[in-house]
C-alpha cells in the first residue's frame, strides 16, 4: 500500500473509495496503517472513532479476528488515558457486528437446509421420501442436512464470534476502568456458548477467566489494576461466576459447575463483607443441584439445610406454603443420605484414608462448615431447627418410619405409599428423592429383619418390598453385604437369606444404628465377658445394698465438704474469669479498631498514590500537548512551503490540470508529499485516460465483430444444413463405389489364387535345394569358428597365467619391503625408548644432585647464622678485641675460605655418595662429611666445639 496517506481523514476517504469498487483488503490495510502509526496517537473523537468503526466493519466482513485484535489494542493505547468510554463504544459495536453476522449465518443455514429438504421431497416418489443416496450420505457422515449446512455456513462465523469474545476479554482484563464492560462481555460469552452449544469453548472460557483472576490477584496495587478489596469489584466477579455456574448447569457440564462453585467460594473468602442473602441463596441452590447430580446426597442434604435456615432467617415475608415446601425438601434430602457403616470408637481412630478425609474437608469448606457432616449430625441439626413441624403431613411419617419405628413387615409398604404420593405431586423436584428413599427403606428393612429372623425365604422378602424387582433386591443385598453394613448371606440353592455369622466368628464390633431390637447372636458371644461383668455388678449391688449406699453417702458428704472448702476460691476464679473475658473483648475491639485504622490508612495511601498517578498523567498530557503544539508549528511551516510549491505548480501545465478540480480547503490540507503525489497522479490520470480511450475503441471493434457474428449465424446455420445434405449424398456415392471396388478386387484375388496353385511343387523343390546348400556352408563356418574360439581361449588363458605370476611377484616384493620398513621402525622406536629412559635417569640424577646442593647450601647458611650468633654473644661478653682474636683462631683452626676459591676446591675431595663415584679418592663430598683429625673431626659436629670456643674466650 502507498505510504503517503498520512492524515487519518484522507485514509478514511481512501478506504471508502476502495470499498466502493469492492476492494476491501486494500481498504483494511490503509486504515491499519493509520491506526498503528505513532504520528496519530493524540485521540480525536471525530476522526478516530469513524476510522475504528469502519476498520472493525472490514475485519468482520473479511473475518480477520487477529487484525481486529491488533486494531483494538492500538486504539486502547490511544484513548485509555483520555476517553475510555470511546473504547467501550467501539468494543460493543464490534461484538454487536459479530453477533449479528452469526445470527444471519444461522438463519441462512436453516433456510438452505429447508430448501434442500424441499428439493429432496419434490424428487422421485412421495412414497419413498428418503432416497438410497441420502441414507448412505447420512450414515457415512453421521450428519443430516442441517449439520452439513451449519458446518459450511454457520461454523466459520461462530468461530469468528468466539475469537472476538476471547480477544476482547484478553484486552480488558485487570483494568479497573473497563471492569464493568469486562464482566458484561464474559456474561455475553456464556450466553454464546449456551446458544450454540459450544462445550469445548465454554471450558476454555472458564480457564481464561480463572487465569485472569489469578493475574489480578498477583498484580494487586498496580495503577489501573482491579482492586479486589473493593466490594463492587467482588460483587461483579460473583455475578459473573454465578452466571458461569448457571451456564454450566444448563449445558450439564458438572465438572465445570463444580469448579465454578469453588471459584465463587474463593471470591466470598476474598471479600471482607459478608455476601448478600440473595447471593447466598442462589449459591446454595446451585451447589445443591451440583451435589445432587454428582450423587453426593450427604452434602446435598447439608446444602438444603443451609438454604432452609438462610431463607427462614433472612426472608421476612415467607409464606407457609414456601416454608412447607422447603422443609419437605430438607427432610427428603436428609433421609436420602445413604446409611453409613457404623464404626466403633476404635475403628474411627484407625481410619487413615487421607484422600477421602481431605476431599470431605474440601467439600465442607464450600459450605463454611467446621467439621465434616454425617447422616446422624444432619438428622440432629434438622431436629434442632424444628423442621418437622413445617413438613407436609403425608411426608412427615417418613422420618418416623425410617428412623424411629421398628416395623419390618409393613415398612416398605408404608414407604411405597409416600413415594406414590410424591409422584403424584405437582412439585417435580420431590420425585428425585424417591429412588434414594426406597434404597434407605430396603436397608432399614434388612437390618430389622436380621434382628428378628435368622433365615427367611427370598420370596417372602420380595413380598415385603413391593417397589423392587428380584434382581434389584438381590443387587441391594449384595451391596449391603459388600459394605459390611449387615451380616447377610444368600443361598440360591434353597432360595433363602441367612442373617448373622457363626457363633464363634465376629469380624468386627456391631454398633447399633437406627431402630434397634436386639444384637446378633455372634455379637452376644463376642461380648459375653462384658455381659457377665454387668450381671455380676448387679448381683453385688443387690447383695451389698446397704454397704454401697452408705459408701455413696460418705462420698457425697466428702464432696460437699470439698465444695464448701473451695467455694470462695471458685467464686473468686469465676469473677476473675469474667474480668479476663472483658479484657479479652476490649483487646479484640482494640485489634479491630487498629485493623480498621490500618485499612483506612491503606485506602488513604492508595488515594494519594492515585492522585500522584493522576498528576503524572496530567503532566504527561501537558507535555504531549506541548509536543503537539511544536509539531503543529512545524506543520504550519511545512504548509507555507507547500503553498509556495502549489503556487509554482499552478503555473505549469501538468500542475494546472492536477489542481483545477481541487477546492481551496483541499489545497490547504496538502503538504509537499501530497503535491508530488498530485503530480504523479495527474500523469497517471492522463495515462489512464489514454488507456480508457483505447479500451473504448477496442470495445467498439468487439461490438462490431459481435454484431457481424450475430447476423451471420442464420446464414451459417443454412449453410450447415446444405453441407449436411451434400455430405450425406457424397457419403452414399462413396460407399457404393467402395462396395463395388471391393467386389471386383475379391474376384481378381480368387482368380489369382487359382492361377498360383500350379506353382507350389516348383516352390517346394527350390526351397529344399536352397536349404541343403546353406546347411553345408553353415557347418563349415561353424567348425572354423569353434577352432578359432579354442585358439583365442588358450591365448587368453596364457596371458592371464603370466599376469598372475607377475602379480604374485610384485605382491611378495611389496610385503618384503613393508616387513623391512616395520623392522626399521621397530628399531627406531626401541632406540628412542632407550634414549628416553636414559634421559629420564639423567634428569633424575640431576634433580637429586640439585637437591643435595640445596641441602648443603641450607646447612652452610645455618652454620653461618650460628657463627654470627656466637660472635655476637662473644662481643657482648668480652669486647671487640677478644672477638677479633677468636675470629682469627676460628679462621686458622677451621680453615675457612681465607686462601680463596682454589683452596676450597682442592679440599673438595672424599666420598660423593654411591651415585657420584663411591669411595674414589677424587670424589667430592661436603666438608662436614670429611674426617680431618687436625681440624677437630667429630668434635666439630658435637658439643666439644662449643666448649672449646667458650674456653678460648
UniProtKB/Swiss-Prot annotation:
<keyword id="KW-0694">RNA-binding</keyword>
<keyword id="KW-0396">Initiation factor</keyword>
<comment type="subunit">
    <text>Component of the eukaryotic translation initiation factor 3 (eIF-3) complex.</text>
</comment>
<feature type="coiled-coil region">
    <location>
        <begin position="593"/>
        <end position="642"/>
    </location>
</feature>
<feature type="domain" description="PCI">
    <location>
        <begin position="323"/>
        <end position="504"/>
    </location>
</feature>
<dbReference type="GO" id="GO:0016282">
    <property type="term" value="C:eukaryotic 43S preinitiation complex"/>
</dbReference>
<dbReference type="GO" id="GO:0071541">
    <property type="term" value="C:eukaryotic translation initiation factor 3 complex, eIF3m"/>
</dbReference>
<dbReference type="InterPro" id="IPR027512">
    <property type="entry name" value="EIF3A"/>
</dbReference>
<dbReference type="GO" id="GO:0003743">
    <property type="term" value="F:translation initiation factor activity"/>
</dbReference>
<feature type="coiled-coil region">
    <location>
        <begin position="670"/>
        <end position="704"/>
    </location>
</feature>
<dbReference type="Pfam" id="PF01399">
    <property type="entry name" value="PCI"/>
</dbReference>
<feature type="compositionally biased region" description="Basic and acidic residues">
    <location>
        <begin position="928"/>
        <end position="953"/>
    </location>
</feature>
<dbReference type="InterPro" id="IPR000717">
    <property type="entry name" value="PCI_dom"/>
</dbReference>
<feature type="compositionally biased region" description="Basic and acidic residues">
    <location>
        <begin position="812"/>
        <end position="861"/>
    </location>
</feature>
<keyword id="KW-0175">Coiled coil</keyword>
<keyword id="KW-0963">Cytoplasm</keyword>
<dbReference type="GO" id="GO:0043614">
    <property type="term" value="C:multi-eIF complex"/>
</dbReference>
<dbReference type="GO" id="GO:0001732">
    <property type="term" value="P:formation of cytoplasmic translation initiation complex"/>
</dbReference>
<dbReference type="GO" id="GO:0003729">
    <property type="term" value="F:mRNA binding"/>
</dbReference>
<feature type="region of interest" description="Disordered">
    <location>
        <begin position="603"/>
        <end position="623"/>
    </location>
</feature>
<dbReference type="GO" id="GO:0071540">
    <property type="term" value="C:eukaryotic translation initiation factor 3 complex, eIF3e"/>
</dbReference>
<feature type="region of interest" description="Disordered">
    <location>
        <begin position="810"/>
        <end position="861"/>
    </location>
</feature>
<feature type="region of interest" description="Disordered">
    <location>
        <begin position="893"/>
        <end position="953"/>
    </location>
</feature>
<feature type="compositionally biased region" description="Basic and acidic residues">
    <location>
        <begin position="895"/>
        <end position="919"/>
    </location>
</feature>
<comment type="similarity">
    <text>Belongs to the eIF-3 subunit A family.</text>
</comment>
<dbReference type="GO" id="GO:0002188">
    <property type="term" value="P:translation reinitiation"/>
</dbReference>
<keyword id="KW-0648">Protein biosynthesis</keyword>
<dbReference type="InterPro" id="IPR054711">
    <property type="entry name" value="eIF3a_PCI_TPR-like"/>
</dbReference>
<dbReference type="Pfam" id="PF22591">
    <property type="entry name" value="eIF3a_PCI_TPR-like"/>
</dbReference>
<feature type="coiled-coil region">
    <location>
        <begin position="732"/>
        <end position="877"/>
    </location>
</feature>
<dbReference type="GO" id="GO:0033290">
    <property type="term" value="C:eukaryotic 48S preinitiation complex"/>
</dbReference>
<protein>
    <recommendedName>
        <fullName>Eukaryotic translation initiation factor 3 subunit A</fullName>
    </recommendedName>
</protein>
<comment type="function">
    <text>RNA-binding component of the eukaryotic translation initiation factor 3 (eIF-3) complex, which is involved in protein synthesis of a specialized repertoire of mRNAs and, together with other initiation factors, stimulates binding of mRNA and methionyl-tRNAi to the 40S ribosome. The eIF-3 complex specifically targets and initiates translation of a subset of mRNAs involved in cell proliferation.</text>
</comment>
Amino acid at each position: 500500500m502507498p505510504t503517503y496517506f498520512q492524515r487519518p481523514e484522507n485514509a478514511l476517504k481512501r478506504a471508502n473509495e476502495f470499498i466502493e469498487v469492492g476492494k476491501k483488503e486494500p481498504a483494511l490495510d490503509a486504515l491499519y496503517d493509520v491506526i498503528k502509526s505513532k504520528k496519530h496517537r493524540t485521540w480525536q473523537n471525530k476522526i478516530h472513532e469513524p476510522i475504528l468503526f469502519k476498520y472493525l466493519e472490514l475485519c468482520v466482513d473479511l473475518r480477520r479476528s487477529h487484525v481486529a485484535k491488533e486494531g483494538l489494542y492500538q486504539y486502547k493505547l490511544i484513548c485509555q488515558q483520555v476517553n475510555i468510554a470511546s473504547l467501550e463504544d467501539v468494543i460493543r459495536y464490534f461484538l454487536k457486528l459479530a453477533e449479528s453476522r452469526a445470527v444471519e449465518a444461522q438463519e441462512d443455514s436453516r433456510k438452505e437446509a429447508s430448501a434442500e429438504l424441499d428439493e429432496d421431497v419434490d424428487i422421485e416418489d412421495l412414497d419413498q421420501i428418503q432416497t438410497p443416496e441420502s441414507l448412505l450420505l447420512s450414515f457415512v457422515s453421521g450428519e443430516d442436512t442441517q449439520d452439513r449446512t451449519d458446518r459450511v455456513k454457520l461454523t466459520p462465523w461462530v468461530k469468528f464470534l468466539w475469537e472476538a469474545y476471547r480477544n476482547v476479554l484478553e484486552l480488558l482484563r485487570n483494568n479497573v476502568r473497563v471492569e464493568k464492560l469486562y464482566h458484561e462481555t464474559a456474561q455475553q460469552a456464556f450466553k454464546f456458548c449456551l446458544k450454540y452449544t459450544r462445550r469445548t469453548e465454554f471450558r476454555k472460557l472458564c480457564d481464561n477467566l480463572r487465569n485472569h483472576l489469578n493475574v489480578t490477584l498477583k498484580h494487586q496495587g498496580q495503577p489501573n489494576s482491579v482492586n479486589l478489596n473493593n466490594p463492587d469489584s467482588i460483587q461483579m466477579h460473583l455475578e459473573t461466576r454465578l452466571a458461569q455456574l448457571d451456564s454450566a448447569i444448563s449445558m450439564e457440564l458438572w465438572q465445570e459447575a463444580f469448579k465454578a462453585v469453588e471459584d465463587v467460594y474463593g471470591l466470598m473468602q476474598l471479600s471482607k463483607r459478608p455476601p448478600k442473602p440473595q447471593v447466598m441463596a442462589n449459591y446454595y441452590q446451585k451447589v445443591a443441584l451440583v451435589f445432587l447430580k454428582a450423587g453426593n446426597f450427604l452434602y446435598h442434604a447439608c446444602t438444603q439445610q443451609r438454604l432452609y435456615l438462610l431463607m427462614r432467617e433472612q426472608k421476612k415475608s415467607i409464606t407457609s406454603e414456601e416454608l412447607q415446601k422447603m422443609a419437605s425438601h430438607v427432610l427428603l434430602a436428609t433421609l436420602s443420605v445413604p446409611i453409613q457403616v457404623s464404626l466403633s470408637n476404635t475403628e474411627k481412630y484407625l481410619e487413615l484414608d487421607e484422600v477421602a478425609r481431605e476431599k470431605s474437608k474440601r467439600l465442607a469448606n464450600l459450605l463454611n462448615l467446621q467439621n465434616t457432616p454425617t447422616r446422624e449430625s444432619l438428622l440432629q441439626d434438622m431436629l434442632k431447627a424444628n423442621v418437622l413441624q413445617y413438613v407436609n403431613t403425608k411426608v412427615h411419617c417418613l422420618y418416623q418410619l425410617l428412623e424411629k419405628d421398628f416395623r419390618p413387615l409393613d415398612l416398605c409398604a408404608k414407604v411405597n405409599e409416600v413415594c406414590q404420593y410424591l409422584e403424584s405431586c405437582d412439585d417435580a423436584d420431590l420425585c428425585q428423592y424417591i429412588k434414594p428413599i426406597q434404597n434407605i427403606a430396603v436397608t432399614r428393612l434388612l437390618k430389622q429383619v436380621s434382628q428378628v429372623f435368622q433365615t427367611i425365604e427370598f420370596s417372602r422378602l420380595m413380598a415385603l418390598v413391593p417397589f423392587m424387582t428380584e434382581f434389584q433386591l438381590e443387587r441391594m443385598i449384595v451391596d449391603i453385604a459388600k459394605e459390611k453394613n449387615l451380616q447377610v448371606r444368600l443361598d440360591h440353592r434353597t432360595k433363602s437369606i441367612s442373617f448373622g455369622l457363626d457363633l464363634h466368628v465376629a469380624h468386627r464390633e456391631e454398633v447399633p444404628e437406627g431402630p434397634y431390637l436386639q444384637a446378633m447372636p455372634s455379637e452376644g458371644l463376642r461380648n459375653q465377658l462384658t455381659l457377665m461383668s454387668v450381671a455380676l455388678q448387679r448381683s453385688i449391688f443387690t447383695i451389698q445394698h446397704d454397704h454401697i449406699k452408705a459408701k455413696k453417702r460418705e462420698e457425697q458428704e466428702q464432696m460437699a465438704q470439698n465444695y464448701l472448702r473451695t467455694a470462695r476460691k471458685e467464686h473468686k476464679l469465676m469473677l476473675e474469669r469474667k474480668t479476663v473475658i472483658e479484657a479479652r473483648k476490649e483487646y479484640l475491639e482494640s485489634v479491630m479498631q487498629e485493623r480498621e485504622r490500618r485499612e483506612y490508612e491503606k485506602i488513604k495511601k492508595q488515594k494519594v498514590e492515585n492522585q500522584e498517578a493522576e498528576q503524572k498523567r496530567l503532566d504527561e498530557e501537558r507535555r504531549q500537548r506541548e509536543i503537539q503544539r511544536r509539531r503543529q508549528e512545524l506543520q504550519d511551516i511545512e504548509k507555507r512551503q507547500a503553498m509556495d510549491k502549489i503556487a509554482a505548480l499552478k503555473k505549469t501545465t501538468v500542475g494546472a490540470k492536477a489542481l483545477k478540480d481541487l477546492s481551496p480547503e483541499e489545497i490547504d490540507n496538502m503538504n509537499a508529499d501530497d503535491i508530488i503525489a498530485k503530480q504523479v497522479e495527474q500523469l497517471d490520470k492522463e495515462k489512464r485516460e489514454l488507456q480508457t480511450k483505447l479500451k473504448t475503441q477496442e470495445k467498439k471493434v468487439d461490438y462490431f465483430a459481435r454484431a457481424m457474428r450475430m447476423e451471420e449465424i442464420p446464414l451459417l446455420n443454412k449453410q450447415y444444413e446444405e453441407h449436411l445434405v451434400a455430405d450425406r449424398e457424397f457419403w452414399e456415392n462413396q460407399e457404393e463405389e467402395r462396395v463395388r471396388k471391393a467386389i471386383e478386387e475379391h474376384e481378381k484375388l480368387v482368380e489369382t489364387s487359382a492361377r498360383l496353385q500350379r506353382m507350389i511343387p516348383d516352390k517346394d523343390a527350390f526351397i529344399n535345394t536352397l536349404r541343403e546348400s546353406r546347411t553345408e556352408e553353415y557347418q563349415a563356418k561353424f567348425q572354423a569358428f569353434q577352432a578359432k574360439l579354442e585358439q583365442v581361449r588358450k591365448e587368453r588363458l596364457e596371458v592371464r597365467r603370466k599376469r598372475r605370476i607377475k602379480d604374485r611377484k610384485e605382491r611378495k616384493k611389496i610385503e618384503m619391503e613393508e616387513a623391512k620398513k616395520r623392522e626399521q621402525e621397530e628399531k627406531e622406536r626401541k632406540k628412542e625408548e632407550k634414549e628416553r629412559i636414559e634421559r629420564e635417569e639423567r634428569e633424575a640424577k640431576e634433580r637429586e644432585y640439585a637437591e643435595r646442593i640445596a641441602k648443603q647450601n641450607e646447612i652452610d647458611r645455618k652454620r653461618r647464622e650460628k657463627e654470627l650468633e656466637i660472635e655476637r654473644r662473644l662481643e657482648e661478653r668480652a669486647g671487640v678485641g677478644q672477638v677479633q682474636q677468636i675470629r682469627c683462631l676460628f679462621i686458622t683452626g677451621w680453615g675457612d675460605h681465607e686462601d680463596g676459591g682454589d683452596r676450597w676446591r682442592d679440599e673438595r675431595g672424599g666420598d660423593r655418595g654411591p651415585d657420584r663415584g663411591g669411595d674414589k679418592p677424587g670424589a667430592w663430598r661436603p666438608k662436614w662429611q670429611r674426617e680431618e683429625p687436625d681440624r677437630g673431626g667429630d668434635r666439630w659436629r658435637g658439643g666439644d666445639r662449643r666448649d672449646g670456643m667458650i674456653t678460648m674466650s
